[in-house]
């Protein structure tokens, strides 16, 4: 729901209902100023959530026939800045608690990454930070679904990006570290498109870890790529698009999901700037 930054919770659910959506992945950043684009949106104040407010939220969802697929918070819990890291982790715990209180049972997020350190060091950091988080969630019957976005788009995330959970190679390593059955994937095929990776095969290999899905597209600008190469800032050779306007083969993607019997949420993630000019366009 981050695209609906100017709407409050009720307004967001109203819009979803009017447009015929059956569920919403609800943005739950901390209250206050956003630190990045599509971040900082808070449709529920998880740190101040009471049983009374939770009941109001659930009642609104029931009346509008819109469920919450997940509570979403995508910070960098492995930030090289220790203060930022601890702040992100602290709020993530509140989001997990709120997901349990609201009987949502899902939190979608990033594992994070120290962008100045190599993969090997980040895996060690992951092994220290994430097992307690996943255990905390499991005790509250909450699944943790990690999106496969590298969070590497421009100079702000250079050089390593801000999320380690980027490829099947790394997924296998992280699932060895945390084999818990409530730790899985929020799969967005668009990130594999611009990295020129296979986005169909992982659906079959990781079928038991596939908890949540994003429908977002990417247009790979091959003329730009031919000039700047894969080591350029990614936004130099790709454009995020709404589903159907990029290079994802949605027929093959949905076919693979049906092959494995996926019956979870599929949420449209809008980061297409062509549709951000007004409320009507959004």
Language-model regions: role of each:
Residues 1-23, 28-30, 56, 62, ...:
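Histidine-acidic metal/acid-base catalytic patches
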Residues 25-58, 117:
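Glycine-rich, proline-tolerant flexible connector loops at the mouths of alpha/beta enzymes
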């Amino acid at each position: 729901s981050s695209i609906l930054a100017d709407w409050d919770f009720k307004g967001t659910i109203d819009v979803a209902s009017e447009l015929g959506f059956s569920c919403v992945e609800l943005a739950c950043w901390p209250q206050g100023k956003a630190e990045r684009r599509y971040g900082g949106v808070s449709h529920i104040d998880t740190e101040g959530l009471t049983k009374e407010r939770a009941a109001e939220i659930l009642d609104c969802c029931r009346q509008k026939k819109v469920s919450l697929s997940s509570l979403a918070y995508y910070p960098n819990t492995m930030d090289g800045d220790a203060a930022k890291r601890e702040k992100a982790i602290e709020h993530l715990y509140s989001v997990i608690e709120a997901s349990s209180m609201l009987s949502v049972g899902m939190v979608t997020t990033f594992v994070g990454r120290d962008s100045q350190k190599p993969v090997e060091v980040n895996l060690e950091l992951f092994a220290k930070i994430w097992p307690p988080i996943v255990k905390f969630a499991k005790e509250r019957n909450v699944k943790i679904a990690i999106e496969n976005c590298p969070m590497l788009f421009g100079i702000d995330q250079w050089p390593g990006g801000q999320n380690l959970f980027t490829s099947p190679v790394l997924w296998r390593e992280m699932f060895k570290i945390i084999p818990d059955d409530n730790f899985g994937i929020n799969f967005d095929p668009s990130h594999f498109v611009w990295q020129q990776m296979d986005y169909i095969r992982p659906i079959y290999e990781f079928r038991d870890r596939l908890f949540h899905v994003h429908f977002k597209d990417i247009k790979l600008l091959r003329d730009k790529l031919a000039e700047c190469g894969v080591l350029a800032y990614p936004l130099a050779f790709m454009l995020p698009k709404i589903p159907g306007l990029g290079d994802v083969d949605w027929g093959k993607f949905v076919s693979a999901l049906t092959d494995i019997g996926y019956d979870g949420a599929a949420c449209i993630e809008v980061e297409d700037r062509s549709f951000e000019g007004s409320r009507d366009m959004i």
